Every structure is written in structure tokens, then in C-alpha cells.
Curated annotation (Swiss-Prot):
Site feature Transition state stabilizer, where: 33, 255
Family under the similarity heading: Belongs to the acetylglutamate kinase family. ArgB subfamily.
Protein role: Catalyzes the ATP-dependent phosphorylation of N-acetyl-L-glutamate.
Database matches in NCBIfam families: argB
UniProt-listed SUPFAM superfamilies: Carbamate kinase-like
UniProt EC number: 2.7.2.8
One Gene Ontology cellular component annotation held by this UniProt entry: cytoplasm
GO BP of this protein: arginine biosynthetic process via ornithine; L-arginine biosynthetic process
Pfam families with a match to the protein in the record: AA_kinase
Compartments reported by the entry: Cytoplasm
Top-level enzyme category: transferase
Organism phylogeny: Bacteria, Pseudomonadati, Pseudomonadota, Gammaproteobacteria, Pseudomonadales
GO molecular function: acetylglutamate kinase activity; ATP binding
Protein name from the UniProt record: Acetylglutamate kinase
Amino acid sequence: MTLDRDAASHVAEVLSEALPYIRRFVGKTLVIKYGGNAMESEELKTGFARDIVLMKAVGINPVVVHGGGPQIGDLLKRLSIESHFIDGMRVTDAATMDVVEMVLGGQVNKDIVNLINRHGGSAIGLTGKDAELIRAKKLTVSRQTPEMTQPEIIDIGHVGEVVSVNTDLLNMLVKGDFIPVIAPIGVGANGESYNINADLVAGKVAEALKAEKLMLLTNIAGLMDKQGQVLTGLTTEQVNELIADGTIYGGMLPKIKCALEAVQGGVNSSHIIDGRVPNAVLLEIFTDSGVGTLITNRKPR
């Protein structure tokens, strides 16, 4: 076999660059929200699974929280159940909640678990109802126009917010060398199911576990300034300034606020990562430049 010296040299450089990061993060917990394009492309799905298995193999503890909005929408359409959204949130009546549980807790969750396990991992699929992993309550949404004397309370059904996270279960799995894969379904005080935004679940899980990092995979290159340039590193103070001056707006606001709250809640750093890039998770963790935006309380890269 002929040795390709250029290829071998590149591999050596990559490993050399990664080694300090591996040492730094060994034994640490990283919570990764998996969604967007990274869940749709077969190549990206395979790369993600391999990334997760490699992280576990070098002593890092990944915890995966996944979305599944498009898959839910597809099944609702096939069942002729109409979808309605208010402020970006799916109105979830009882019939829709049944579909959400079926898709997230069944199809999507088990597909991810199976993919990770096929590449050598030991993943276990969970919903928030397992051992009351995610206790939740109904999310209250209000709207007020200048003509209203009081805000209007809008009922969006079985949409919830996180009350608490059962860290005992997750810590037991992590210490047992398992990789938890969590569907964002919460359980209420009376056993009712709640559909919860996956970013919010990932953020609350990261806070509860005192994770080293929260990583949110997206379909964009990262946070951008008004000139369209990616901002690779920001403090929480700088992010708040960008929100105030309108640089960050619209659909990115909930995701950014989730990342901010995680850092303010004790997570060392949050990352908005371009999930369209192959091996994005490894590149963000193990390279100097990364592939997205890092948010932290201290001066970042």
C-alpha cells in the first residue's frame, strides 16, 4: 500500500489540533439540539451519528435533544389534519398531540437511536414522559393590540414549557456509557402530554445538567451582523446589544434567547452551529475556528 504523505500529514494536523480540546472536554457533558437540514440529508445524518459516537469514544458525554417539525407536518397532512401556527408555535389539540407523540417519540426518536447504534454507539431513546424526565406545564400565550385594554389569552392547546428535568435518570445513563436521545414531549402534573419547542428543552436540559456546552444545529451559518458576516464569538452582553439594535430579529430570536438563558443559567457556552456543514459538531468542538457562533459570559474566540 502506497502512503499518501499529504493525506497522512493532514490527518496528523487534524489530530494535533483536536488533542487539546479532547483533553479539555473529557468527562464533560454536551447537550446537542439536532434538527433542520442535518436531520434530512442522509450524508449529514450519517456524519452526525459518527460525530456523536466519536465524542463518546474519547470520553465526552453527548446528550441529544431532537426536533421533528417537518415530519409532524407531513403526517398531519396525510391524515388530513390541518395545522395552525401562532407566533411560530403549532396549535396542538388532542388529535395533533397524538400525532406529535407518534412521530417524535416513535419514528424520529427511534430512527436517530438506531442510526447512532449502527455506528457503534449505545443510544437510548426517551421522551419527557419516561421517568417524568421533563415535567411541564401549559404554555400561556397572550396578545395585545393598542385597542385592547387587557391582553387576550390565546389557547394553543397541548403546548408546554419545562418545569423541571429529572437529572438523576440522565446522569445514570451517562455514567453507564449510554447516549440519551430525547424527544421534546413533556408530562404535566396529571399525566397529560405537552409538545415543547426542542430548542427550549435542550436549553433546560443543559442548565439542569450543568453542561459544558449547549449546541443548537441550525440551517444558517451562525449569527450575522448587518453586513451579512458571521459573528464567530459573542458575549451575552453583546448579544443583548444586537437584539436591542435589531440585528437579531424574527425567527432567530427564540433560539438566541434560549442560548442566552442557558449561559445565564450556568452552561459554560452556547453555540449556534451550521448543521448543513458535514461533521459540524466535531468542527465546532475540536477546531480553533469552529463553524458557527459561540456565546459565553467571558470574551470568546
